[in-house]
Amino acid sequence: MIKQLVLGVAVLAMIPSGSKSASIAEAGEFHTALTEQVCLANNIYWEARNQTEEGMIGVGLVVRNRVNDNRFPHSYCEVVHQGPTRPSWKNPNNRIPVKHRCQFSWYCDGRSDDIRANELDIYTIASDIAHRIYSGDITDITNGATHYHADYVIPAWAATKIRTVKIDNHIFYRWEF
């Protein structure tokens, strides 16, 4: 709820002045950019909220690297939400993620995706990092990584990727062509 309220206020506050049609078009572009940054911030928060800022940046850069890789979707939200879906039992026209089958586990773990009230400061950091990554203000410290995992697991796919760097407790990999 807090996230949606902040997003709505930010969109209204940033609508440019000028002609009505230009304002609507610019507001639409701004809303898209803001939505993309919220998707990225959510992923950074849920995947790396217990990491240093460098670790959070690494996780965010993997999403950006995937957006820029033709093997993945071409928007931040599509990358974060990538995975199989199924029809909702309430409304078959509404598709929902298949539990535990998403690219990023938090997105389809069946738990609430609401930001924890006692971690708003961490979400603020994640949002700032997301904005800087989206704006191109952060150099890639992952050496082009498109994948990562926690250092306490060894997924089968790790053997097929090139390890690039370890930041905090995440190991990053690049998927070669």
Where are these regions (language model features)?
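Bacterial extracytoplasmic/cell-wall-associated proteins, especially those involved in peptidoglycan
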Residues: 21-177
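Sec-dependent N-terminal signal peptides
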Residues: 5-13
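C-terminal segment of classical bacterial N-terminal signal peptides
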Residues: 14-21
